[in-house]
Curated annotation (Swiss-Prot):
GO terms for molecular function: copper ion binding; cytochrome-c oxidase activity. It is found in: Mitochondrion inner membrane. Cu cation A2 binds at C196, E198, C200, H204. Mg(2+) binds at E198. It is an enzyme of class 7 (translocase). The gene is COII. This is Cytochrome c oxidase subunit 2. Residues 49-62 are mitochondrial matrix. Component of the cytochrome c oxidase (complex IV, CIV), a multisubunit enzyme composed of a catalytic core of 3 subunits and several supernumerary subunits. The complex exists as a monomer or a dimer and forms supercomplexes (SCs) in the inner mitochondrial membrane with ubiquinol-cytochrome c oxidoreductase (cytochrome b-c1 complex, complex III, CIII). Component of the cytochrome c oxidase, the last enzyme in the mitochondrial electron transport chain which drives oxidative phosphorylation. The respiratory chain contains 3 multisubunit complexes succinate dehydrogenase (complex II, CII), ubiquinol-cytochrome c oxidoreductase (cytochrome b-c1 complex, complex III, CIII) and cytochrome c oxidase (complex IV, CIV), that cooperate to transfer electrons derived from NADH and succinate to molecular oxygen, creating an electrochemical gradient over the inner membrane that drives transmembrane transport and the ATP synthase. CDD domains: CcO_II_C.
């Protein structure tokens, strides 16, 4: 989860988020280099006393400032396209979780496993225990096994929502009457927090998301408790 005065991205806890962080750093480096180069040329332009009033054209320099930006754009576009395909790629998922946005809470359905369903509401501030996070903790956490490919089916029964967990690299719109699909694979055990990322009404700020990634044996025990 994010920390106070944090300026960077959250630590990546899924292969997808790790790739997104790498691409962010790659693109940011290119932007910094371009900004520095343009700033240098602007400073040089305003500080020198030479005039070029009689320079009508320059084929060489025009070729350079056309070809080099094209190469830079391709260097940014290729990893971006690769990431877009990785986000959509879901191959033989071990589990499918259906997420439905309501006004204003989330419900989860494990239809592969005896049709387990439950609602997840934010815990009010006056009911929080020590160690809980205000506006982030819920009464029912969604559990999933770590290091397993999971398919998420996300929709809404009312207004537009967006199911987002930044540290897992997931942000998917929940649209009424439509199923959107995303993939999830968690690297390590832990509790990961997110929130609705689409302004959806008066309860928008009170729709937290909590994903708890556990080992396979612990996940099976949790399933037994849900079934019983």
């Amino acid at each position: 989860m994010s920390q106070w005065f944090q300026l960077g991205l959250q630590n990546g806890n899924s292969p997808l988020m790790e790739q997104l962080i790498f691409f962010h750093d790659h693109a940011l480096l290119v932007v910094i280099l371009i900004t520095s180069l343009v700033g240098f040329f602007l400073a040089a332009l305003f500080s020198n006393k030479f005039l070029h009033r009689y320079l009508l054209d320059g084929q060489a320099i025009e070729t350079v400032w056309t070809v080099i930006p094209a190469i830079i754009l391709v260097a940014i576009a290729l990893p971006s396209i690769r990431l877009l395909y990785l986000i959509d790629e879901i191959h033989n998922p071990a589990l499918t979780i259906k997420v439905t946005g309501h006004q204003w809470y989330w419900s989860y359905e494990y239809s592969d496993l005896n049709d387990i369903q439950f609602d997840s509401y934010m815990i009010p501030s006056n009911e929080l225990s020590t160690g809980m996070y205000r506006l982030l903790d819920v009464d029912n956490r969604s559990q999933c096994p770590m290091i397993k490919a999971i398919r998420l089916m996300i929709t809404s029964d009312a207004v537009l929502h967006s199911w987002a967990v930044p540290s897992l690299g997931i942000k998917m719109d929940a649209d009424p009457g439509r199923l959107n699909q995303s993939s999830l694979l968690v690297n390590m055990p832990g509790v990961f927090y997110g929130q609705c990322s689409e302004i959806c009404g008066s309860g928008h700020s009170f729709m937290p998301i909590v994903i708890e990634a556990v080992g396979e044996s612990d996940f099976l025990k949790w399933l037994e408790l849900q079934i019983s």
